[in-house]
Regions:
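Hydrophobic, well-ordered beta-alpha structural blocks that scaffold small-molecule cofactor pockets
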Residues: 1-48
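Short amphipathic alpha-helix with an adjacent loop that forms part of the alpha/beta core around
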Residues: 59-69
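E1/E1-like adenylate-forming module used to activate ubiquitin-like modifiers
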Residues: 100-149
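ADP-ribose/adenylate-binding Rossmann-like module
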Residues: 73-80, 84-113
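Structural motif
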Residues: 12, 72-73
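An accessory alpha-helical subdomain
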Residues: 129-213
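Conserved acidic residues
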Residues: 55-57
Length: 213
């Protein structure tokens, strides 16, 4: 499998199944997409900013639900293999991406694995074991949380500096931005939410290039 990042802004995601797994999937996608959760019952859990539809569709009714909701992605999170099979089949027939919460290992065309993620916006790090070991994914995610702390602020800072360095040669620009990213002083300033983090970064660039930004 090859990891891809998909922008679900403005897209619709259908989660079939209102148990703990369905709730977790709904919360995750609701950060960005319009989420509809379809289930006969709902747990006393948060489903994020999602719409809940109370219904118990049979496998034969799944195609009609997909046609009605028209999602970009459908998540099969029920405890019925027959129902999950029907969801997968109907999604495949319509060219809709699908994710099965009850399946690990290899996937067919059009089926996706939703990896564990660590966020420090706009930075996102994803970890996947191909759904073969969710426990390992969770462990690695916890390890990464401290590693990328502050990466979001660094991304915003270097993105701004890159725009300001647009007139210098690409080689000099890359070297300057790498120096900022490698600078412990800049990371420390960002970690303490210091207002002078930008000045520290420009000083690093000036030391390298002999010019100020």
């Amino acid at each position: 499998m090859i990891p891809l990042v998909h922008d679900f802004t403005g897209e619709r995601v259908l989660v079939v199944g209102g148990g703990p797994v369905g709730a977790r999937k709904a919360r995750r996608f609701a950060r960005e997409a319009e989420v509809v959760v379809l289930s006969p019952t709902f747990e006393a859990e948060s489903y994020g900013d999602s719409q809940r539809l109370r219904a118990a569709p049979d496998p034969e009714e799944i195609p009609d639900w997909l046609d009605r909701i028209d999602p970009a992605l459908v998540v099969a999170a029920t405890d019925s293999t027959d129902l999950n099979d029907a969801i997968e089949r109907a999604a495949d027939e319509r060219g809709i991406l699908s994710n099965r919460a009850d399946r690990s290992g290899s996937r067919n065309l059009g089926q996706v694995v939703v990896p564990a993620t660590v966020r420090d916006d706009p930075v996102v790090a994803a970890i996947s074991t191909g759904a073969s070991s969710p426990a390992l994914s969770r462990h690695l995610r916890q390890e990464l949380e401290s590693t990328i702390s502050g990466a979001g602020s660094m991304a915003e800072l270097t993105g701004s500096l890159r725009d300001e360095l647009a007139t210098v040669s690409s080689e000099t620009r890359r070297a300057a931005l790498r120096a900022v990213v490698d600078s412990e002083a800049v990371w420390k300033a960002l970690d303490t939410e210091s207002a002078n983090a930008r000045q520290v970064a420009t000083d690093v660039i000036a030391d390298l290039t002999g010019d100020s930004v």
